[in-house]
Amino acid sequence: MASHTADADAKPDSDSQKLLNVLPVSLRLRTRPWWFPIQEVSNPLVLYMEAWVAERVIGTDQAEISEIEWMCQALLTVDSVNSGNLAEITIFGQPSAQTRMKNILLNMAAWHKENELQRAVKVKEVEEFLKIRASSILSKLSKKGLKLAGFPLPLEGRETQMES
């Protein structure tokens, strides 16, 4: 019994501690879920997606993966490729689950791209509106000879003031 107590109180071996310090820390270290059969790990489906789209679909720090996995009964791994510009998504599971997962991810990616495009168009429209509005306000002020604090008069307004 004394030997068991001594083993429990002993410090860890320095070689094993060095080995643990050398190993890279992965964000996705985990055990296989109880519902996922081990045979399904052998034939993964791999797809590539732009990194910003993958981040929106899967969430920052891959927060949505467990919910997506449970919903489709397939496992996902996401790795950064091409210096962070692409995301490699590996899908493990039955072929039907892989196809379902791929379709869901691609549809979500298409939705996010379309949403981003619509947002960019709206921003462009707002910028154009503000430019037009600001120029009309400045032209009205220059006609009246007024000046907004911090805003110089338009070029034609300066010339008329210098001549008089």
UniProtKB/Swiss-Prot annotation:
InterPro entries: KH_dom_type_1_sf, KHDC1, MOEP19_KH-like. Pfam families: MOEP19. Keywords: Cytoplasm, Nucleus. Transmembrane segments: none annotated. Residues 44-105 form the KH domain. GO terms for molecular function: RNA binding; structural constituent of cytoplasmic lattice. Expressed in ovaries, where it is restricted to growing oocytes, with greatest levels in fully grown oocytes. The keyword Cytoplasm applies. Induction: Induced by etoposide. Its main location: cytoplasm. GO terms for biological process: actin filament organization; embryo implantation; embryonic pattern specification; establishment of spindle localization; establishment or maintenance of apical/basal cell polarity; fertilization; in utero embryonic development; positive regulation of double-strand break repair. It comes from the Eukaryota. Disruption phenotype: Embryonic death at 2.5 dpc. Progression from embryonic 1- to 2-cell stage delayed 6-8 hours. Less than 20% of the embryos progress beyond 2-cell stage. Embryos form unequal sized blastomeres due to smaller, dysmorphic, and displaced mitotic spindles resulting in asymmetric division. Decrease in thickness of subcortical F-actin in zygotes, thickening of F-actin bundles in the cytoplasm and loss of F-actin cytoplasmic lattices. Decrease in CFL1/Cofilin-1 expression in the subcortex and diffused distribution in the cytoplasm of zygotes. Component of the subcortical maternal complex (SCMC), at least composed of NLRP5, KHDC3, OOEP, and TLE6. Within the complex, interacts with NLRP5, KHDC3 and TLE6. The SCMC may facilitate translocation of its components between the nuclear and cytoplasmic compartments. As part of the SCMC interacts with the SCMC-associated protein NLRP4F. Forms a scaffold complex with KHDC3/FILIA, and interacts with BLM and TRIM25 at DNA replication forks. Contains an atypical KH domain with amino acid changes at critical sites, suggesting that it may not bind RNA. Component of the subcortical maternal complex (SCMC), a multiprotein complex that plays a key role in early embryonic development. The SCMC complex is a structural constituent of cytoplasmic lattices, which consist in fibrous structures found in the cytoplasm of oocytes and preimplantation embryos. They are required to store maternal proteins critical for embryonic development, such as proteins that control epigenetic reprogramming of the preimplantation embryo, and prevent their degradation or activation. This is Oocyte-expressed protein homolog. It comes from Mus musculus.
